Amino acid sequence: MNIKRKPEWLRIKLGEGRNLNYVKGLLKKFSLNTVCEEANCPNQIECFSKKTATFMILGSDCSRSCGFCNVSHGALQPIDPNEPENVANAVAELGLKHVVITSVTRDDLADGGAQHFADVVNQIKSKNKETMIEVLIPDFQGNKEALQKVVQSKPDIINHNMETIPRLYPEIRPKAEYVQSLELLKNVKEMDPEILTKSGVMVGLGEGEEELIEVFKDLRGSGCDFLTVGQYLPPSTKHYPLKAYISPEVFERYKEEALKIGFSFVASSPLVRSSYNAAEALEKHEEMKS
């Protein structure tokens, strides 16, 4: 397959965009960032049109520069003390039933921004009693005390993405550690078994199928409940190069394998991103329990 030419299954239908400007205006009003825009997510038009967004806290610049990521890594900004309340107000104004909170990585902060995550969760809960809260967190450099702050705020889901297979970490996530990320997910379950955990991987980076299945097994071994698998799309020619477009049939096979391994929900298709249709995983989990 010619990897320079995007296959048909990755061509996005723009759909209805009547709420796009409304959501963007709301974000500007509350001085908020979304990972949808910062990471140039292929689903942002659809999600904005449904009046949903994944809020990105702790500024718009990251302390790391992972090879796959489009988030900028310039001068790090002071934490905005009004951000927790602003996020909570935006959630209320949008009427969200499920909100995802993520962040840039802030290795410059003593707790990696963990207390700020907790403050955001608590503010959302105070103003939006029925909203389900998912946090997509960095690794906090393995700091268990920092992780405990997030866990104690009791979000419904804690997500931490593995991103790729361990062999590719030196190129894709040079400042992260594969085992440390697995330990984070395991530690969440040890700290609070009621919190659901989630992780995501990208494909098309040069991974082998057997290597990917081993990551699935490692994640389940760490107690991970939900899994997302999506196609890597390089943001620019300066980012890590695309090695392959993965067909929808292979994504379906990955989903079947992951479900056999024991995940309670798997989203696996070319345009899946870790926050895309995030509420669906929780709905499926509740159905399985009932």
Curated annotation (Swiss-Prot):
Organism of derivation: Alkaliphilus metalliredigens (strain QYMF)
Known pathway: Protein modification; protein lipoylation via endogenous pathway; protein N(6)-(lipoyl)lysine from octanoyl-[acyl-carrier-protein]: step 2/2
Keywords attached to this entry: 4Fe-4S, Cytoplasm, Iron, Iron-sulfur, Metal-binding, S-adenosyl-L-methionine, Transferase
Transmembrane stretches, start-end: none
Stated family: Belongs to the radical SAM superfamily. Lipoyl synthase family.
The protein's name: Lipoyl synthase
Cellular compartment(s): Cytoplasm
Keyword Calcium: no
Gene name tied to this protein: lipA
Cofactor(s) for this UniProt protein: [4Fe-4S] cluster
GO molecular function: 4 iron, 4 sulfur cluster binding; lipoate synthase activity; metal ion binding
Primary subcellular site in the record, as a coarse category: cytoplasm
Domain Radical SAM core: 48-264
